[in-house]
From Swiss-Prot:
Official protein name in the record: DNA topoisomerase 1
UniProt family annotation: Belongs to the type IA topoisomerase family.
Lineage of producing organism: Bacteria, Pseudomonadati, Campylobacterota, Epsilonproteobacteria, Campylobacterales
Catalysis: reaction(s): ATP-independent breakage of single-stranded DNA, followed by passage and rejoining
UniProt-annotated catalytic positions: 297 (o-(5'-phospho-dna)-tyrosine intermediate)
Record GO biological process: DNA topological change
The species this protein was found in: Helicobacter pylori (strain J99 / ATCC 700824) (Campylobacter pylori J99)
Superkingdom, natural source: Bacteria
Keywords: DNA-binding, Isomerase, Magnesium, Metal-binding, Repeat, Topoisomerase, Zinc, Zinc-finger
Cofactor(s) it depends on: Mg(2+)
Segments forming domain Topo IA-type catalytic: 129-552
Record: residues binding Mg(2+): 8, 82
Toprim domain mapped to chain residues: 2-113
């Protein structure tokens, strides 16, 4: 009888299967096999506590049946889902669905997907950690309660489609606060006095008549000119020369947040893209040794490194760079995050032997770039510090002092691998008390800059420092805010949209703890305590739920509705009522103000450019774009009285290329294409790129696997569906 190993992803299952003999069967759960019901709160709440109502997703039902049948035939079923709390919970749900005692399922975890790692963990299984599971359940229930209850309230007071959530709203407030600093900012002009002394010493005025000048202090142009005129007449000497040796410490290896930050700044990758590529590198790619994982687990807040990996790195440094670059002892790093899960490892290559050059014919260009970044950072983390000599020279006269600074690299250390963008700034050879001639003195104007908007990388850095969310939530949180149209990211800068201001205004006034970073961080600590058996998850939920629901009820009464519908001056053709403009998550539309008694609606004039000025040849009505399982088409807005439809293929204004959506594989344009079998969406770079989708791709990312989403009709309901993992979100629902 075969042994069964259950992992999360098909790619991981395929890789692991290559390492094992025929006595093992490896199957993927494809993420969560069950979750809270999507069409209700999904939690029973009474005096006994909080009972989640888990439902198997329709797309997982056949898979679950398959896993149950395989488990019945297996002598041992190993739960080998990811090592974080989410993975522990997925393993727990799989075991529950199979049935039997939880203790009967050996639990194995691995930081890397290599043959040795897999064979070793099979020898040392443990049990499913219910404390970790309860921590994940508490997080899931908390987020559902906040999202479901608060989103419903926000949508009822502002407009349908808006949402709020425990982590997303705290993150959004950071963006809003920065916008509030930027919008009223008024630039200030200030002046500096910059001198050039012979032989070529550049210095800046730091004090005048015994008073030190503060940064941006000199704002009067006339005053700056007067000081310049006075100092030009003075004689100068070298007042002091200070030289100091300074170390540039080696950077630690990557954890999730720092990998996302570096990939953003150095490679231009979004956090979502970084995690998607990292997942592929972790789960298994082609190498000269066969298919295997080439990096360790990518969702981690730990800086620990396995002893064997440290020894490999040190041996590599000694061999390739010599003993001068090798510290006496291996360098050990610890995370600044007090809640870091130190049992995990930092992100590193699974084998230091697999140099980037050895993989250039096996990895895609972007995979190779990210792997190279991880490889070099890990190897550099075990090298000697770089050493600099800093110089500071003060030039003085009776009325003022000028200062010049320089730096010289003495030993490159870790820069040997990572490179050094800072060029040496060498100062001329000088002696204290020697006279020096002023060659030129200039008064230069400068303008203060507003606070910089967050980039995705800098926002993640702040979220991490404040304890908001965990490594697994940083990228999905930013994607979620984009998908909700709260923020936009242009040229690496995050700016808030107007709907975000309205939501945060309400939350700050009525639910201040939801947007308080300290509150969010304290909840993360509570979840950590649950995972460590220091807190009861039912009590944590209870302590949060009842005060929160009191505020929800108060909000229903006290929050003033901001829904204002613009009048069109037109009458409803069905009941004679007034037509007004409304908004939904699908955009602007026109509806009768007698709703719900009258349900007449039509689209605005600027909606759906494809249908603009297109009239129904049967009744004279307006042809509007609609969607079916076969894609987009035109239909008369007088349906059901008129059932005229028209293919977009024959529409003069139809757009073949999808605006604002790029291919997730190569970055090319995506266009509607046709074959004998029907229409589909494909990449314009075909045949170099084979991306295709049966449904129209949209500029949103899957919150589960971060791949591109599509829009479709599923069982007569509008839905967004991931093109890769098929995760589906019905647009009628909004759980936040």
């Amino acid at each position: 009888m075969k042994h069964l190993i259950i992992v999360e992803s098909p790619a991981k299952a395929k890789t692991i299967k290559n390492f094992l003999d025929k006595n093992y069967e490896v199957v993927a759960s494809k993420g969560h096999v069950r979750d809270l019901s999507k069409f209700a709160l999904g939690i029973k709440i009474d005096e006994t506590g909080f009972t989640p109502n888990y439902v198997v997703d329709k797309d997982h039902k056949e898979l679950v049946k398959q896993i149950i049948e395989l488990s019945k035939k297996a002598s041992i079923t190993y739960i080998a889902t990811d090592e974080d709390r989410e993975g522990e919970a997925i393993g727990y749900h799989v075991a529950c669905l199979i049935g039997g005692k939880l203790e009967s399922y050996p639990r194995i975890v691995f930081h890397e997907i290599t043959q040795n790692a897999i064979l070793n963990v099979l020898k040392t299984p443990r049990k499913i950690d219910m404390f970790k599971v309860n921590a994940q359940q508490a997080r899931r229930l908390l987020d559902r309660i906040v999202g479901f209850k608060l989103s419903s309230l926000i949508a009822s007071k502002i407009t349908k489609g808006l949402s709020a959530g425990r982590v997303q709203s705290a993150a959004l407030k950071l963006v809003i606060d920065r916008e509030k600093e930027i919008r009223p900012f008024k630039p200030l002009t200030y002046f500096t006095l910059d001198a050039l002394f012979e032989p070529h010493l550049e210095a800046q005025l730091i004090s005048y008549k015994g008073n030190k000048l503060k940064a941006q202090e000199l704002i009067d142009e006339k005053k700056a000119q007067e000081i310049k005129n006075e100092l030009e007449k003075e004689s100068y000497i070298i007042s002091s020369i200070i030289k100091k040796s300074k170390k540039s410490p080696t950077p630690p290896p990557f954890m999730t947040s720092t990998l996302q930050q570096s990939a953003s700044s150095l490679l231009g990758f979004s956090p979502t893209k970084t995690m998607s590529i990292a997942q592929k590198l972790y789960e298994g790619v082609a190498t000269p040794q066969g298919v295997m994982g080439v990096i360790t687990y990518m969702r981690t807040d730990s800086l620990n490194i396995a002893k064997e990996a440290l020894e490999e790195a040190r041996a590599k440094i000694l061999k390739d760079y010599g003993k001068d670059y090798l510290p006496p002892k291996a360098k050990v790093y610890s995370s600044k995050n007090k809640n870091a899960q130190e049992a995990h490892e930092a992100i590193r290559p699974t084998s230091i032997i697999l140099e980037p050059n050895a993989l250039k014919d096996y990895l895609k260009p972007e995979e190779l770039k990210l792997y190279t970044l991880i490889y070099k950072r890990f190897l550099a983390s075990q090298m000697q510090d770089a050493l600099f000599e800093s110089q500071s020279v003060v030039v003085a006269c009776e009325k003022g002092e000028f200062k010049a600074s320089g730096r010289k690299l003495l030993f490159d250390g870790h820069y040997k691998i990572l490179g050094n963008d800072d060029k040496d700034k060498l100062l001329p050879n000088l002696k204290e008390n020697d006279p020096i001639k002023l060659e030129k003195l200039e008064s230069n104007a400068h303008v203060t800059e507003p606070p910089a908007r967050y980039s995705e990388a800098s926002l993640i850095k702040v979220l991490e420092s404040l304890g908001i969310g965990r490594p697994s939530t940083y990228a999905p949180t930013i994607s979620l805010l984009q998908n909700r149209d709260y923020i936009k990211v242009e040229k690496k800068q995050i700016s808030a949209l107007e709907s975000a201001f309205k939501v945060i205004e309400i939350l700050e006034k009525h639910f201040e703890e939801i947007v308080d970073s300290k509150f969010s961080a304290s909840l993360e600590e509570e979840l950590d305590n649950i995972a460590q058996n220091k807190a009861d998850y039912q009590q944590v939920l209870k302590d949060f739920y009842y005060p929160f629901m009191d505020k929800i009820e108060a909000g229903k009464k006290n929050i003033i509705s901001q829904k204002v519908h613009e009048k069109t001056g037109q009458s409803c053709p069905k009941c004679g009522g007034e037509l007004v403009k409304k908004n939904s998550r699908y955009g602007e539309f026109i509806a009768c103000n007698n709703y719900p008694k009258c349900k007449y609606i039509k689209q605005t004039e600027n909606a759906n450019d494809e249908a603009k000025q297109e009239l129904c040849e049967k009744c004279g009505g307006e042809m509007v774009q609609k969607f079916s399982r076969n894609g987009a088409f035109l239909a008369c807005n007088n349906y059901p009285e008129c059932k005229n439809t028209k293919s977009l293929k024959n529409t003069p204004n139809a757009k073949e290329t999808i605006e604002g959506v790029k291919c997730p594989e190569c970055g090319g344009d995506i266009a509607l294409k046709r074959s004998k079998k029907g229409s589909f969406y494909g990449c314009n770079n075909y045949p170099k790129c084979n991306f295709l989708s049966n449904h129209k791709p949209i500029n949103k990312r899957c919150e589960k696997c971060h791949y591109l989403m599509s829009e479709r009709i599923y069982r007569k309901k509008k839905a967004h569906e991931c093109i890769q993992c098929k995760e589906r979100v019905f647009l009628e629902e909004d759980n936040g």
